[in-house]
Amino acid sequence: DQQAHVLRAELGAAAAFSGITSRSWPSERGLLDPAGPMSLVTTGVGPYQVETSLVVLENTHNFGGGTVQPIEAIREVRASTQPLGVAMHLDGARLWNAHVATGVALSAYGEQFDTVSVCLSKGLGAPVGSVLLGSADRMAEARIWRKRYGAGMRQVGILAAAGIHALDHHLHRLSDDHARAARFAAACAEAAP
């Protein structure tokens, strides 16, 4: 949507580095209405329009204040894009928060997308680290593009260990963070109605 992190906060990287043309739809606090992205999907349009190859969704929505996307809405978009051969990517940097807030399994979110990115530092407390998930073929291609962009790292075992620790020991504590955030928001609302 128009407030998506990949559009607002990445300095136009998709266009600058990859020549990608992006289109976006309006939303209320980032909440997904399946009609939004589907109104922009174009396939089989000949040589005069750009065909849609990817729909990107964000969960939770950063600039929407942490809006959690309903799994039903995500499934509806997937059911519409899949027959058209349009891939889906989840910017799931904060997916852990959606999982904890809704009880929806991480795998239930993941199975709706061709690729998913998650961040190990946002919410989980790892010092750094993001992970891209997808099929073996897509990950092989992603490794090639990572190398082309000069994004490889060496000696990352210590960072991987921190990420594994965060997954094993911090995910279940996110509900405590949610409770503290709700108390803080309530106190702010009471202090400044």
For each of these PLM feature ranges, what is it?
Residues 1-193:
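Conserved PLP-enzyme active-site core in the AAT-like
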